[in-house]
């Protein structure tokens, strides 16, 4: 993977990834396909929304269907019929959030897995092997995630352990001699000084990109933005910056404003399944009875499949009947909205009009309360 910044408007950056002839423009939003599928839609439909790179979770795929099944197909790309790049999360967050039993030591984590309840030992070495077998284009290091609002000492200990695992991840990743990329993850909670230490040590190890972990986990938005203001300028300018698990449309705007290049989040797909649909002026809650006889499309500025062929009234009906088609059409629309937003952001950076674009975004967003 090669990465190059081509345009800059203040701190906002526009660049390209080159994955063996597959060109991905940044800033980029990655739909989440945790189990090798973006919920309710096919890979062809994912492409048609404008999505070019997706995220899957190595932790979940390791347990179900398991590496043996995926390797029968060659790799994760073949298994799910996706020709574009795939970034895999190492599973650090899932180990700590899903497990009923979890014991951490310097070598890894012993936990009770959520599929059959068996004790499992996950280490940086195993995580790198899993992601290598999956054929991930971007591999994330194995890290220790902790809850927001932990004290300085606990946060420091977790950050130092993540650094130790980062070194191990680098060694084991390199041993596979593949041409994929490895990203480090900056930790340190809400403490800027710990974030500084984490980043500087990761830079010494030398990764292909740097992710900001442990954010959007309950902290006030202003705290997240302050940390981005603090840490992004310190990340090497020639390396991509990835804000993990974020976010809402306004988070994408504010992340890009601070120099972030990559995002992922379940919000567009999860909200779609719950009838919350993003449009130019805000969010339509399609379950509201006022849409029962509304013959207009979701958003007259949108050219997605859903907006071209279906009315709000029909989408309201599908939701009321709990029809699977409703989740599919809603997901297509929300992902198309996100990818259109990212495309417009990139164009504004190229034209040095990002600030004006963001002002217009907020003006339109707050114009109507749906």
Swiss-Prot record:
Pathway: tRNA modification; tRNA-queuosine biosynthesis. Its cofactor is Zn(2+). GO terms for cellular component: cytosol. Gene3D superfamilies: Queuine tRNA-ribosyltransferase-like (3.20.20.105). Substrate binds at residues 89-93, 143, 214. The active site is at 89 (proton acceptor), 264 (nucleophile). Zn(2+) binds at residues 302, 304, 307, 333. GO terms for biological process: queuosine biosynthetic process; tRNA wobble guanine modification; tRNA-guanine transglycosylation. It catalyses: 7-aminomethyl-7-carbaguanine + guanosine(34) in tRNA = 7-aminomethyl-7-carbaguanosine(34) in tRNA + guanine. Its EC number is 2.4.2.29. Keywords: Glycosyltransferase, Metal-binding, Queuosine biosynthesis, Transferase, tRNA processing, Zinc. GO terms for molecular function: metal ion binding; tRNA-guanosine(34) queuine transglycosylase activity. InterPro entries: ArchSynthase1/Queuine_TRR, TGT, TGT-like_sf, tRNA_ribo_trans-like. Binds 1 zinc ion per subunit. The keyword Glycosyltransferase applies. Residues 245-251, 269-273 are annotated as: RNA binding. Homodimer. Within each dimer, one monomer is responsible for RNA recognition and catalysis, while the other monomer binds to the replacement base PreQ1. Catalyzes the base-exchange of a guanine (G) residue with the queuine precursor 7-aminomethyl-7-deazaguanine (PreQ1) at position 34 (anticodon wobble position) in tRNAs with GU(N) anticodons (tRNA-Asp, -Asn, -His and -Tyr). Catalysis occurs through a double-displacement mechanism. The nucleophile active site attacks the C1' of nucleotide 34 to detach the guanine base from the RNA, forming a covalent enzyme-RNA intermediate. The proton acceptor active site deprotonates the incoming PreQ1, allowing a nucleophilic attack on the C1' of the ribose to form the product. Belongs to the queuine tRNA-ribosyltransferase family. This is Queuine tRNA-ribosyltransferase. It comes from Buchnera aphidicola subsp. Acyrthosiphon pisum (strain 5A).
């Amino acid at each position: 993977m090669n990465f190059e910044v081509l345009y800059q408007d203040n701190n906002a950056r526009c660049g390209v990834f080159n994955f063996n002839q597959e060109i991905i423009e940044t800033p980029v939003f990655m739909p989440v396909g945790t189990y090798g599928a973006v919920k309710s839609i096919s890979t062809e439909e994912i492409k048609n929304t404008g999505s070019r790179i997706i995220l899957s979770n190595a932790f979940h795929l390791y347990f179900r269907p398991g590496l043996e099944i995926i390797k029968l197909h060659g790799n994760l790309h073949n298994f799910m019929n996706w020709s574009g790049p795939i970034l895999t999360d190492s599973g650090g967050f899932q180990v700590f959030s899903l497990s009923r039993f979890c014991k951490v030591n310097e070598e890894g984590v012993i936990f009770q897995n959520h599929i059959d309840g068996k004790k499992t030992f996950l280490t940086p070495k195993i995580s790198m092997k899993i992601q290598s077998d999956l054929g991930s284009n971007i591999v994330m290091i194995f890290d220790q995630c902790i809850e927001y609002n932990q004290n300085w000492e606990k946060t420091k200990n977790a950050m130092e352990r993540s650094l130790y695992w980062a070194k191990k991840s680098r060694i084991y990743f390199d041993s596979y001699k593949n041409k994929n990329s490895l990203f480090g993850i900056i930790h340190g909670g809400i403490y800027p000084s710990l974030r500084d230490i984490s980043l500087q040590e990761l830079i010494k190890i030398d990764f292909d990109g740097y992710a900001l972990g442990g954010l959007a986990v309950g902290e006030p938005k202003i705290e997240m933005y302050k940390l981005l203001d603090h840490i992004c300028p310190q990340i090497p300018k020639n390396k991509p910056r990835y804000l993990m698990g974020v976010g809402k449309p306004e988070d994408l705007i504010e992340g890009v404003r601070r120099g972030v290049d990559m995002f992922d989040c379940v919000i567009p797909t999860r909200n779609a399944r719950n009838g919350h649909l993003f449009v130019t002026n805000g969010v339509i809650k399609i379950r509201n009875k006022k849409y029962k006889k509304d013959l207009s499309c979701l958003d007259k500025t949108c050219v997605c499949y859903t907006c071209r062929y279906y009315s709000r009234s029909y989408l309201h009906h599908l939701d009321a009947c709990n029809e699977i088609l409703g989740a599919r059409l809603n997901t297509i629309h929300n992902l198309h909205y996100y990818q259109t937003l990212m495309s417009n952001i990139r164009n504004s950076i190229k034209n040095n009009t990002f600030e004006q674009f963001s002002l217009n975004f907020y003006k339109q967003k707050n114009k109507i309360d749906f």
